[in-house]
Amino acid sequence: MAGRERVSDHGEVSMSKHAAVESDEHVAERTAEAARQVERLTRWHDDFPTPGVRFADLTPVFADAEGFRSVIESLAACAPDADLVAGVDARGFLLGAGVAATLGTGVLAVRKGGKLPPPVISREYSLEYGSAALEIPGNGVELRGRRVLLLDDVLATGGTLAAAAHLFVEAGAQVVAAAVVLELEFLGGRARQGDYPLTSILRLP
């Protein structure tokens, strides 16, 4: 994509806001193509990881060159002016790295509890099949004032994404947008999110 580059306060080189923003029509086309790839490649598993849960396996999407490229391009268009991309443990790491490379920003892994050395910023949350915690570094990475694009693979009950967003707010950052590959609308996860824009490539009622 052609455009004028700028250097942020945190050293990332990215495109100027006006040059980087694609037309709404182009973004819609990217999202529609990515949605087709996700629908075609996703595998479904009943009663996994616990009885009554239907698990969406996006591994084939990530392993397919065309599918992965479509997903990354679609997610990157959600917040072209972000200066940090954050991916939620674990498949969000794959998304975060790809989108950060596309936007020319850094990437931060939002880890599950107990995976980072102290100090950490931590938040507990509930899953559709249990509970867990998420963490980000409490020092070593300057987060105050950062413009964060937050990524995860699936939006189900919404607890994971909401907890991740809370971590960055607590650290003094701004979540400028959040995006997921697949949204299970019947679980109502969107209602648990903050006032940041939330994009889903494929939404299943």
Sequence positions of predicted segments:
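PRPP-associated nucleotide enzymes
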Residues: M1-P205
